[in-house]
UniProtKB/Swiss-Prot annotation:
InterPro entries: Rbsml_bL25/Gln-tRNA_synth_N, Ribosomal_bL25/Gln-tRNA_synth, Ribosomal_bL25_b-dom, Ribosomal_bL25_C, Ribosomal_bL25_long, Ribosomal_L25_dom, Ribosomal_uL5_bac-type. This is Large ribosomal subunit protein bL25. It holds the Pfam family Ribosomal_TL5_C. Part of the 50S ribosomal subunit; part of the 5S rRNA/L5/L18/L25 subcomplex. Contacts the 5S rRNA. Binds to the 5S rRNA independently of L5 and L18. Belongs to the bacterial ribosomal protein bL25 family. CTC subfamily. Keywords: Ribonucleoprotein, Ribosomal protein, RNA-binding, rRNA-binding. One of its GO terms (molecular function) is structural constituent of ribosome. HAMAP family: Ribosomal_bL25_CTC. The lineage of its organism: Bacteria, Pseudomonadati, Campylobacterota, Epsilonproteobacteria, Campylobacterales. GO terms for cellular component: cytosolic large ribosomal subunit.
């Protein structure tokens, strides 16, 4: 479980001092809870996010424990370093909006026909309760030929999960190389 510290002061000077000490500024918020301003050690946070198996993960700030999902993050445009993260605290049985990653498997047939695999969307917006949240959508791209694509409506349907993106949006496809 990730452990962080609660920020007593939310001033700019305090944030700069924490960043200088290797901390990542974070906000935890959600339906029915008071916003918590916190900070996590940057490197352990990134390592934990890369190793986690589920979208929802536990964090501890002070003496409070939250089940959270990364809602939004900000990176430094020059160094590409993570500088801020918003964590949405989830409550079982309460529907929320999430962004679920799309993973693909297989090698498209169209690559042999001088095509290029084009990822149009990396994440799909869904609305559901946290206990029904899929960890990812897996797309098999092996049957795709040149000028073919997989649309949102072609994704597998999960029970109690509503996809918010329009069903005619392309998720992944193979285009002809020029």
């Amino acid at each position: 479980m990730l452990e962080g510290v609660i920020r007593e002061s939310i001033t700019k000077a305090n944030a700069k001092a924490l960043k200088k000490d290797g901390y990542l500024i974070a906000n935890v918020y959600g339906k029915g809870i008071e916003n918590v301003n916190g900070a996590f050690k940057l490197n352990p946070f990134i390592k934990y996010l890369k190793e986690k198996k589920h979208l929802i993960f536990p964090v501890k700030l002070g003496d409070k424990t939250f089940e959270v999902v990364v809602q939004e993050y900000q990176k430094n445009p020059v160094t590409n370093e993570l500088i801020h993260v918003d964590l949405l605290a989830v409550t079982k049985g309460v529907k929320s909006k999430f962004k679920v990653p799309i993973k693909h498997q297989g090698t498209p047939v169209g690559l042999k026909n001088k095509g290029i695999l084009m990822l149009s969307k990396k994440r799909i917006s869904v609305e559901c309760a946290p206990e029904h949240l899929p960890d990812h959508y897996l797309v098999d791209v092996a049957p795709l030929d040149v000028n073919e694509s997989i649309l949102v409506r072609d994704l597998e349907k999960h029970e109690n999960v509503k996809i918010l993106d329009h069903d005619s949006i392309a998720v992944i496809g193979v285009i002809k190389a020029k």
